[in-house]
């Protein structure tokens, strides 16, 4: 039987040893160290317990050849005398007190590693990729600085050269395909992938010259730097399913079909609904999605409202009730409507009966109307100030110029006020399959993909400022894609923003103490609030 033995030493210390009973006698297996204080004794006892529970370490300690004792050289013999000079007794060496040699956030790392494994990413078999993904979740930084973040998480980081080799592996073969497949498997097992959400964003580079990928194009931030266009497909909860990048001058509307097609081919998915915002609304886009047997829900533009709602305006004027929904038609191209405004009843869209139209759903909200009116009032005030010469500015909305004189466009203001509170949606899903309320609810799930983009551009800093080549950018986006999946899963389990989770868990520091040549790491005391977060993330999978 193996046990821990405490023995007083001649120097007044307490030796901690691991021993066993063999043939009725005690046999020392390993000498752990000598303690001079209660604190040091506690450290050595904990170290001994760890050695006893880890046979591999104990075997190494037992089989290691003990270092020979260091003996000081004696002085050469001097002349003989009748009485030898007094010789000082050898000094008793005492090890110094215990010292803290490091502290880290390994509790946080263990929690994120558990989530990474639950998503199936551990089957990729690449520990360096895993560390780069988790480092980006915790603190986005350059590849060169990732080692510092990993060290702070209690990891021994790979060398910079190894990290670069990992990035090369990521862009070769089917690495991103494997990541996307694992994301799909997780999403399909834990949620609903019959409806997916798509959106695009731009990531700019502070460089002077364009190349084949980084080009100057349309930027919502009005930047003139070379950029790339990134498309992201997520499920209705915002969990990432597909990512792709395009040339910076590529129209956003021309990115949706390649991403959707790649997703379908990879996972053999045929029947699904694609939701996108009004920026994806182009006649060609919708036609191609329909020809690919895909169902879609996209936001409509306000300029379509007078045509789509012609019947309502004829029979009811501009009067709407809060929550009112109008299910009607919208022209596929142009302004010619198949809706007969002379009929009071709105037509029910049928693809065979209305080949030149899509189904349009318009909803009125009093809350939205109040917000729209507030915006219109400000715009009208600005326009009147410009017309009155009180304010010099670029021509604002509702101001027209006639013979060099600015005038207020009263007709445009009236048309705008007639449409306050309205929001439109275009779809090719018949009412028999999806009612108007579900169409509206599905579209409003788009905030999840918008939130994912905000996470990737802020919390994960997706902008690859240190990447220069196309392969490096693609590898960077693969890491961001996996990091977004981990972050989304953490948020889903805790109900907290990933930034909040990191702010609460990263300060939980484990301390490593060295004493008598031995090192032992002690976990932090975890307050109840942080323990609740850990339990939500991994249950009892993390041992402290």
Across the structure, where does each feature detected by a protein language model lie?
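Anion-binding and metal-coordination hotspots
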Residues: 3, 13-15, 25-26, 112-544
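Short, surface-exposed polybasic/aromatic micro-patch for ligand or macromolecular engagement
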Residues: 4-53
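Intrinsically disordered, low-complexity segments enriched in small/polar residues
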Residues: 8-10, 31, 70, 76, ...
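Low-complexity, intrinsically disordered/propeptide-like segments
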Residues: 44, 63, 85, 332, ...
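Generic short alpha-helical segment signal, independent of protein family or function
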Residues: 49, 53-56, 168, 487
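Extended, charge-enriched "interface" segments that sit outside catalytic cores
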Residues: 55-154
């Amino acid at each position: 039987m193996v046990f821990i033995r405490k023995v007083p030493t001649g120097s007044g210390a307490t030796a901690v040893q691991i021993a066993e009973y063999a043939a009725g006698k005690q046999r020392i297996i390993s000498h752990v160290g000598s303690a001079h204080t209660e604190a040091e004794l506690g450290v050595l006892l904990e170290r001994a317990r760890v050695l006893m529970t880890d046979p591999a370490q104990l075997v190494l300690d037992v089989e290691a050849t003990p270092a020979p004792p260091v003996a000081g050289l004696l002085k050469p013999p001097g002349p003989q005398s009748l009485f030898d000079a007094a010789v000082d007794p050898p000094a008793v060496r005492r090890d110094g007190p215990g010292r803290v040699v490091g502290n880290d956030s390994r509790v946080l790392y263990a929690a994120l590693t558990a989530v990474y494994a639950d998503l199936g990413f551990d089957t990729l078999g690449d520990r360096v990729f895993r560390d780069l993904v988790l480092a980006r979740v915790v603190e986005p930084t350059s590849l060169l600085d990732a080692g510092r973040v990993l060290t702070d998480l209690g990891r021994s980081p790979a060398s910079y050269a190894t990290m670069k080799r990992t990035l090369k592996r990521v862009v070769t073969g089917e690495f991103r395909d494997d990541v996307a497949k694992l994301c799909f498997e997780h999403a399909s097992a834990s949620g609903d992938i019959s409806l997916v959400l798509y959106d695009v964003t731009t990531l700019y580079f502070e460089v002077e010259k364009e190349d084949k990928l980084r080009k100057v194009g349309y930027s919502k931030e009005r930047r003139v730097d070379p950029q790339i266009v990134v498309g992201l497909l997520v499920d209705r909860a915002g969990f990432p399913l597909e990512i792709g990048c395009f040339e910076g001058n590529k129209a956003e509307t021309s990115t949706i079909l390649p991403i959707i097609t790649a997703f379908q081919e990879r996972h053999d998915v045929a029947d699904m609904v694609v939701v996108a915002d009004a920026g994806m609304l182009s006649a060609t886009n919708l036609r191609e999605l329909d020809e690919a047997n895909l169902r879609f829900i996209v936001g409509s533009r306000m300029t379509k409202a007078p045509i789509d709602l012609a019947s309502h305006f004829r029979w009811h004027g501009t009067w709407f009730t809060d929550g009112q929904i109008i299910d009607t038609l919208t022209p596929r191209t142009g302004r010619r409507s198949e809706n007969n405004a002379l009929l009071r009843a709105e037509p029910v869209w049928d693809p065979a009966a209305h080949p030149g139209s899509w189904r349009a759903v318009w909803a009125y909200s009093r809350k939205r109307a109040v917000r729209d009116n507030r915006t219109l009032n400000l715009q009208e005030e600005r326009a009147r100030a410009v017309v009155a010469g009180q304010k010099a500015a670029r021509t604002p909305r509702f101001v027209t110029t006639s013979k060099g004189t600015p005038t207020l466009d009263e007709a445009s203001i009236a048309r705008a006020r007639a449409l306050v509170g309205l929001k439109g949606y275009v779809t090719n899903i018949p009412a028999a399959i999806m009612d108007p309320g579900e169409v509206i609810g599905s579209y409003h799930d788009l905030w999840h993909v918008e939130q994912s983009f905000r996470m990737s551009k802020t919390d994960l800093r997706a902008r690859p400022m240190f990447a220069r080549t196309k392969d490096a950018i693609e590898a960077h986006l693969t890491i961001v894609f996996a990091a977004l999946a981990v972050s989304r899963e953490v948020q889903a389990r805790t109900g907290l923003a990933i930034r909040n989770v990191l702010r609460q868990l990263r300060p939980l520091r484990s301390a490593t103490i060295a004493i008598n040549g031995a090192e032992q790491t002690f976990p932090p005391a975890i307050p109840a609030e942080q323990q609740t977060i850990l339990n939500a993330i991994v249950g009892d999978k993390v041992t402290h």
